[in-house]
Design a protein with these regions (language model features):
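Phosphate/pyrophosphate-binding catalytic cores of soluble transferases and nucleic-acid-acting enzymes
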Residues: 2-163
């Protein structure tokens, strides 16, 4: 146990994740590209909208030339039709970080989605995947009977949480 604790401490001392956060159009992207060029590293986006291929307007994505110059992760990563969550983002990002830290010792994470950033910086509670048929059933109940029906079910099944 002590050896693994020592190894973890050495890993953390050797490897650094630099986080650049802030509101849209505050200069985060330009700063991250400047730093990545200077440090010879890659960029991980923690933006909940830049991840989607179809969302380009209003998301302040890096330019095509910036994307060619510096390796960016999670820009145009998937379609808006794909199911995605902060939990999935957290798992994928942690895998990428492990891989990157085997090659380089500093990585830049940039974006304004606080929940995405917090999932990496502080961790996230893991929840089991909800079965598709359960989701469909609850959505149907909501559409047909409204939120009051869902609230009464919650009160019945988990009165402590409901209150």
């Amino acid at each position: 146990m002590l050896n693994s604790a020592i190894a973890a401490e050495k890993f953390l001392m050797k490897n650094k994740l630099v986080y650049i956060g802030g509101p849209t159009c505050s200069g985060k992207t330009n700063l991250s590209i400047l730093l990545a060029n200077t440090l010879g590293t890659e960029i991980i986006s923690c933006d909940s909208r830049q991840v989607y291929k179809e969302l380009s307007i209003g998301t302040a994505k890096p330019s095509k030339s910036d994307l060619k110059t510096i390796k960016h992760h999670f820009i145009d990563h998937l379609s808006i039709h794909d199911e995605y969550s902060v939990g999935t983002y957290s798992m994928e990002t942690n895998e990428i970080l492990k891989s990157l830290f085997n090659k380089i010792n500093i990585v830049i994470m940039v974006g304004g989605s606080g929940l995405y950033a917090d999932s990496i910086l502080y961790g996230i509670d893991r929840f089991p995947k909800v079965k598709t048929d359960i989701k469909k059933q609850l959505i149907s109940l909501f559409k047909n009977e409204g939120i009051k029906r869902l609230n009464s079910m919650l009160e019945e099944y988990d009165p402590e949480y409901y209150n």
